[in-house]
């Protein structure tokens, strides 16, 4: 069915209920296919009939949502709406499937509000992690801890992080991201808030508090992955992940930059109290303003909901809450090489991430002999770069897919940049003689690392959408084991060789090997997990 909007000299409605005037707008309403808002009618088109078919591009305008036509000075009596039964062409159908909302529509949509809240949660997640990376310097000095023992204290977070991702991913797949994320933020904020009292009680209480932070934060990324898969169509998921992970990296910046300031004002435990309370403020907004899926969101517009469903070609499984209590098919998941591609990539990502996050303040303090505030600043700059490049990578990834690049090739391009780039940059870091140069190399490494989020991280949703939560949990568990080895191993490695350089070179080589493995075995297509390899 095609609908024509003409500018006439008199009122002439074939379908009188199809056009309603509201202020300076004419709105097509009656039994129309979903059409997109036309922001204006150019002067040259005011005397030209515009045929509006769903998704069809006419005069470089795309129509997908409820149509609202600004009158732009056109007299109301010169508007006419008529309809015909013209058959839609394949080209029109294809155009409908590729029509994209403009930037203002995208940025004000409910799905972007949801991903913005996810970004804030991930920012708090990393801020609560990184506090100990700064606090460990004065703690180790005041209590006489060696570098190897400092590594063990920092790894206590990872021991907790090790046990929760698979269980958390399974819970996310069953109950949805809203509920599980709420519990996660509540628990890790409480544990962070109580850390000062735990530290004053005993070493074991401190280790237990940090382990509890790790347990609770293990659900954060599976929740993000699950909600992005439900709220965003494939052509927007890269940008959504880019926004969420930008918050993730900005949490590092906020934690590293604010912690020394808060320590100078409120003592060594000041940041733990402030960041812990911030989590509870976030929780109030999250519970009142979000839903696990778009079809359960009370404020989403009909046009946005239809757009999401149409672009996703949503299945029954994606539309309804997964209520089965069955055990996920771990054997079948592990029988496929694409699963191992994302597991290996996530393991290397976690190794590099936690080594840099945990050891860079100590690295700058001990190698370049800068004070704590300067060490925190040099360590924070790279994460600012990662937040910026992450969104650029997401935009570029979506653009490649919209222009016809296969999802598989797009993921491999992003992953290659995200691992080969840091590998080369870390080799450069070993040659730096000044802290400013070292921070520049580190910024390049961490900035390029963000491209891998548009490789392996989003790839989880594509190869196993029905198991994305549990698969992400499996990857995080493997990654946490790698992070424990890297974080603890770095301390022993430095004590054994007396230098950070050898460990940085080892990390660079592992990045390059992981990129090769991913390019050989990864795919962007859905994998059949109903049969074993």
Curated annotation (Swiss-Prot):
Gene3D superfamilies hit by this protein: MFS general substrate transporter like domains (1.20.1250.20)
Keywords, ordered alphabetically: Chloroplast, Membrane, Plastid, Transit peptide, Transmembrane, Transmembrane helix
Transmembrane feature ranges: 117-137, 152-172, 179-199, 203-223, 243-263, 267-287, 342-362, 376-396, 417-437, 438-458, 474-494, 502-522
Protein's recorded name: Probable anion transporter 4, chloroplastic
Pfam families cross-referenced by the UniProt entry: MFS_1
Gene field: ANTR4
Induction: Expressed with a circadian rhythm showing a peak during the middle of the day (under long day conditions).
Family the UniProt entry places it in: Belongs to the major facilitator superfamily. Sodium/anion cotransporter (TC 2.A.1.14) family.
Protein species of origin: Arabidopsis thaliana (Mouse-ear cress)
Function: Inorganic phosphate and probable anion transporter.
């Amino acid at each position: 069915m095609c609908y024509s909007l003409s500018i006439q000299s008199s009122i002439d409605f074939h379908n009188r209920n199809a056009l309603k005037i509201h202020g300076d707008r004419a709105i097509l309403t009656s039994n129309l296919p979903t059409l997109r808002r036309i922001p204006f009618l150019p002067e040259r088109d005011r005397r030209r009939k515009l045929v509006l078919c769903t998704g069809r591009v006419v005069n470089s305008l795309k129509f997908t949502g409820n149509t609202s036509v600004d009158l732009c000075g056109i007299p109301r009596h010169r508007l006419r709406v008529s309809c015909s039964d013209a058959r839609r062409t394949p080209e029109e159908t294809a155009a409908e499937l590729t029509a994209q909302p403009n930037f203002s529509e995208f940025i004000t949509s409910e799905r972007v509000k949801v991903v913005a809240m996810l970004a804030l949660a991930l920012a708090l997640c990393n801020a609560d992690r990184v506090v100990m990376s700064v606090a460990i310097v004065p703690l180790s000095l005041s209590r006489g801890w060696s570098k190897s023992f400092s590594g063990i204290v920092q790894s206590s977070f990872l021991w907790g992080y090790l046990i929760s991702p698979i269980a958390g991913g399974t819970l996310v797949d069953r109950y949805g991201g809203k509920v599980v994320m709420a519990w996660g933020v509540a628990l890790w904020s409480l544990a962070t808030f109580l850390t000062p009292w735990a530290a004053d009680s005993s070493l074991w209480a401190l280790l237990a508090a940090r382990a509890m932070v790790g347990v609770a934060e293990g659900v954060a990324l599976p929740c993000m992955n699950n909600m992005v898969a439900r709220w965003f169509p494939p052509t927007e998921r890269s940008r959504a992940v880019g926004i969420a992970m930008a918050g993730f990296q900005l949490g590092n910046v906020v934690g590293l930059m604010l912690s020394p300031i808060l320590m100078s004002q409120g003592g060594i435990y000041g940041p733990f109290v402030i960041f812990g309370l911030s989590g509870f403020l976030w929780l109030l907004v999250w519970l009142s303003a979000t839903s696990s899926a778009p079809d359960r969101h009370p404020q989403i517009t009909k046009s946005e909901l239809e757009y999401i469903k149409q672009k996703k070609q949503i299945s029954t499984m994606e539309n309804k809450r997964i209520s089965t209590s069955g055990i996920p098919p771990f054997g079948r998941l592990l029988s496929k090489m694409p699963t191992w591609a994302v597991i290996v990539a996530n393991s290397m990502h976690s190794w590099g991430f936690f080594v840099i996050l945990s050891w860079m303040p100590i690295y700058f303090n001990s190698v370049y002999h800068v004070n704590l505030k300067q060490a925190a600043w040099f360590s924070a700059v790279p994460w600012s770069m990662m937040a910026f490049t992450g969104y650029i990578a997401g935009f570029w990834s979506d653009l490649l897919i919209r222009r016809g690049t296969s999802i598989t090739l797009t993921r491999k391009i992003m992953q290659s940049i995200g691992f080969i780039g840091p590998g080369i940059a870390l080799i450069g870091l070993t040659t730096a003689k000044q802290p400013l140069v070292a921070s520049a190399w580190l910024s390049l490494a961490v900035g390029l690392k963000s491209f891998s989020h548009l490789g392996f991280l989003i790839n989880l949703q594509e190869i196993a959408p029905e198991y994305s939560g549990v698969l992400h949990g499996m990857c995080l568990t493997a990654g946490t084991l790698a992070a424990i080895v890297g974080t603890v191993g770095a301390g022993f490695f430095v004590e054994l060789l007396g230098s950070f350089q050898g460990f940085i070179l080892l990390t660079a080589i592992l990045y390059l090997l992981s990129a090769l493995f991913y390019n050989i075995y990864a795919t962007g297509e859905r994998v059949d997990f109903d049969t074993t390899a």
